[in-house]
Structure formats: C-alpha cells, structure tokens
C-alpha cells in the first residue's frame, strides 16, 4: 500500500493571499495569522508572499483565479469574513465565495485554501480570528503549504 502524506515546511513556496477589506477589523487578524504561519512554520520567505486586497468575500474567487492563472504561485490563500445578517445576502455571499474558490482550485490545479469565516455573529468571527477558536488564517496557510507538498508527492 502506498500512503502519501506531506509536511508543511515549504521554504521555496510562492504564496498569494487574497483578502477582503469588508470586515477588515477581523480579517486583519486572519492575515497576521496566515503570514506568521507561512514564515514561522512554513519557512516561506517574505519576498515569496504576495497580498492582494479585494472589496469583499464575493470578489475573492475572481482574484484567486487571476492569481492562479499567472503561474507565479504555488498556492493561493483566500481570507475574509461573512457574518449572517437579517437577509438572504449571507447565503449568496458565503456560497458564492466557497463555490467559486473550489472551482478555482479544481480548474487551476493549485491549492486554494479557504480561510473565509462564515459565522452567525461578530463574536464567533472574533473567536475564530485568533482568540478562543484559534486563528483560521493560520490554519488556511498551513493547509495551503501541506497541499503544495501533497501535490508534489502525487506528481513525483
């Protein structure tokens, strides 16, 4: 039996992070967590990290797709926060972002890590951006790095 697993240390990785400005008071913490994980755990060099800001979570798939198509990056990390309100807007934005990012990953065949919080409240979002529930930005970064190495191992 063959088993493929990979670690997260990827010093030569070229990683793009696309991040939503909307809810930036939460997203800034996700970005800090992602960059810290890339550098400290993944050993990614600062010059190999590109950050692209977009207006909101709905725009993340378009930016991620454009970044993936350049061929310059080994992975894309998408960061944002969608908080449920009193209308159906939450479902459209959260669904559009998650489905769009999944399509980008499948079409480009590079890892697109989903670091978009979809929460019921601001409190839940804050918990997932570096307090009680860890930092989902850091988790997305580690996922991206591991998947870079998993795909390399599959293709080897």
UniProtKB/Swiss-Prot annotation:
Its EC number is 2.5.1.78. Belongs to the DMRL synthase family. Pfam families: DMRL_synthase. GO terms for cellular component: cytoplasm; cytosol; riboflavin synthase complex. This is 6,7-dimethyl-8-ribityllumazine synthase. 5-amino-6-(D-ribitylamino)uracil binds at residues 22, 57-59, 81-83, 114. SUPFAM superfamilies: Lumazine synthase (SSF52121). The keyword Transmembrane helix does not apply. (2S)-2-hydroxy-3-oxobutyl phosphate binds at residues 86-87, 128. Forms a hollow icosahedral capsid composed of 60 subunits, probably arranged as a dodecamer of pentamers. Unlike in B.subtilis, does not interact with riboflavin synthase, and the core of the icosahedral capsid is empty. Pathway: Cofactor biosynthesis; riboflavin biosynthesis; riboflavin from 2-hydroxy-3-oxobutyl phosphate and 5-amino-6-(D-ribitylamino)uracil: step 1/2. The gene is ribE. InterPro entries: LS (IPR034964), LS/RS (IPR002180), LS/RS_sf (IPR036467). The active site is at 89 (proton donor). PANTHER family: 6,7-DIMETHYL-8-RIBITYLLUMAZINE SYNTHASE (PTHR21058:SF0), 6,7-DIMETHYL-8-RIBITYLLUMAZINE SYNTHASE DMRL SYNTHASE LUMAZINE SYNTHASE (PTHR21058). It catalyses: (2S)-2-hydroxy-3-oxobutyl phosphate + 5-amino-6-(D-ribitylamino)uracil = 6,7-dimethyl-8-(1-D-ribityl)lumazine + phosphate + 2 H2O + H(+). One of its GO terms (molecular function) is 6,7-dimethyl-8-ribityllumazine synthase activity.
């Amino acid at each position: 039996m063959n088993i493929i697993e990979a670690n997260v240390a990827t010093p030569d990785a070229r990683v793009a992070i696309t991040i939503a400005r909307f809810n930036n008071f939460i997203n800034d913490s996700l970005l800090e967590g992602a960059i810290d994980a890339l550098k400290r755990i993944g050993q990614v060099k600062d010059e190999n990290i590109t950050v692209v800001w977009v207006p909101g979570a709905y725009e993340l798939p378009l930016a991620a797709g454009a970044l993936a198509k350049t061929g310059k990056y080994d992975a894309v990390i998408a960061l944002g926060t969608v908080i449920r309100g009193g209308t159906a807007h939450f479902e459209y934005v959260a669904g559009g972002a998650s489905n769009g990012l999944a399509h980008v990953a499948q079409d480009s065949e590079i890892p697109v890590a989903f670091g978009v919080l979809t929460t019921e409240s601001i409190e839940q979002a804050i918990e997932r951006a570096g307090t009680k529930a860890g930092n989902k930005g850091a988790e997305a970064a580690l996922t991206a790095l591991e998947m870079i190495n998993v795909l390399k191992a599959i293709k080897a």
